[in-house]
Amino acid sequence: MSMTDLLHAEDIKKAVGAFTAVDSFDHKKFFQMVGLKKKSPEDVKKVFHILDKDKSGFIEEEELGFILKGFSPDARDLSVKETKTLLAAGDKDGDGKIGADEFSTLVAES
């Protein structure tokens, strides 16, 4: 399954394009723009599993830095600052990574 099976390619393009400037990434706006906010909990979990590149059941800090690439291969990497901000927003239990339930909560709060 690919991201475009779950989200509209045009929405992905617009959302990724809105945050091309370094340190401009806003996960709440991004999740809304890309259409993730309107998706069912099942679809949000499917998106999580696409972003969990090493299939560990978590999106670790390193994977978070590449989150935009998970939506669009030619997107930029997040800066260290953006990655840390996103991790802090999503990591509810403080284990340094984001699990599927934490990701769902992060999207729901957007």
From Swiss-Prot:
CDD domains: EFh_parvalbumin_alpha
Binding site for Ca(2+) 1: 52, 54, 56, 58, 60, 63
Alphabetized InterPro entries for the sequence: EF-hand-dom_pair, EF_Hand_1_Ca_BS, EF_hand_dom, Parvalbumin
An example Gene Ontology biological process: excitatory chemical synaptic transmission
Cystine bridges: none
PROSITE patterns in the cross-refs: EF_HAND_1, EF_HAND_2
Written domain comment of the UniProt record: AB domain, comprising of helices A and B, is involved in structural stabilization, protecting the hydrophobic core of the protein. It is required for high-affinity binding of Ca(2+) and for Mg(2+)-binding.
Record protein name field: Parvalbumin alpha
Organism expressing this protein natively: Bos taurus (Bovine)
